[in-house]
Amino acid sequence: MNIGKYIFAQVIDFIPRYQFDKLVKKYKGDWHAKDLSCYNQLLHLLFGQITGCVSIRDICLCLEAHGSSIYHLGIRKSVNQSNLCRANEKRDYRIYEGLGMYLIGIVRPMYSNTKVAEITIDNVLYALDSTTISTSIVLAAWALGKYSKGAVKMHALLDLRGSIPANIHITDGKWHDSNELDEIVPEPFAFYMMDKAYVDFIALFRFHKAGAYWISRPKDNMRYEVVNHRIDFDPSTGICGDFIIKLTTHKSKKLYPEPIRMVTYHDSVTGNDVEFITNNFEISALEVANLYRHRWDIEVFFKWIKQNIVVKNLWGYSENAVRTHLWVAIIAYLIIAKIKADYKSPYSITEVATLIRVSALERVDLRDLITKPKDSIIQKQNFKELTLFDEF
């Protein structure tokens, strides 16, 4: 039991300190450090992420206001805004990148048995996508985006079993999504769901030869011919067609010489027919559509990262500061995911993060906080609401 210990102090107990110290030593993070060590910098930034501070100024102001409690939060000493900004600019971001990748290796296996809704196959399922964070081209000249604007891209390969990232890659805004396939080592028998921006037949054929499966949507200018019709589908499920096609342009059929499967699905909500392409010929046509639909799980992940883990406003503009900020955001997400798995919380990762955020400065037991049955909390809330209205 951790009654008497702040929630935030209990959360940071999940940081793999030995591994972090090894990274600090490797990249000489604490070289000539006085008041602000790399670990203290990490705690300041995690405090900002977990409590929802929107700027470095907010972090320092909040910790200063709780000066009498700061030691009990696990933070050795609070620092001013300029020192924290300077650390973000100068301390090697690879320290935090290394910690993030280490946590990915720990947390992903904890969710390996999680089932994906409406999916019957046991293959590993990945969604690949990116999110763009706008910034000032004047303040962040390194982060070139489209139309002479500044932008930073976070590319994520998300394991759909638990929505845990398998890989994170941060680039400037001009890095094309299809280039990201070159950064991935295909996993045999795994499914990779991606939108049409990733359709690069050289890379997709490399995935195919490696024994991996991919599902995407055809680009508008894709030229092909139907070589066979598959008839083993149920039209009542929304499947309109299941075909085997071959690419017909000289360049594309040279880049991808093998047949491709095309599935057409009628979306009853929008009234539109949607086409999918894949190199898998074994699963049902409806399974193809359902798998691609789960690609939207990564959009929910990005939206949650932006809204709940603080990346709406960047905490610095140099490349090192931006990468540090984004990696600390991912570290916060992974720590919360680890807490949920370790304590077998019935709540989603989002709900666990919310409970921790609103209780960060309370002295309660973390396990009790996130494992209380949902029904008891709802009943307690309803009782309070009824009591309130009974007074009128």
Segments (PLM) and residue ranges:
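Active-site- or DNA-interface-adjacent structural scaffold in DNA-acting proteins
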Residues: 76-141
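Extended, structured, electrostatic nucleic-acid-contact surfaces
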Residues: 67-74
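A short, hydrophobic/aromatic-rich structural module that often spans a beta strand
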Residues: 75, 112, 382-386
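Single, function-defining residue in the core of a domain
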Residues: 1-58, 62, 98, 119-124, ...
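Extracellular beta-strand-rich solenoid/capping regions of secreted or surface-exposed proteins
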Residues: 143-145
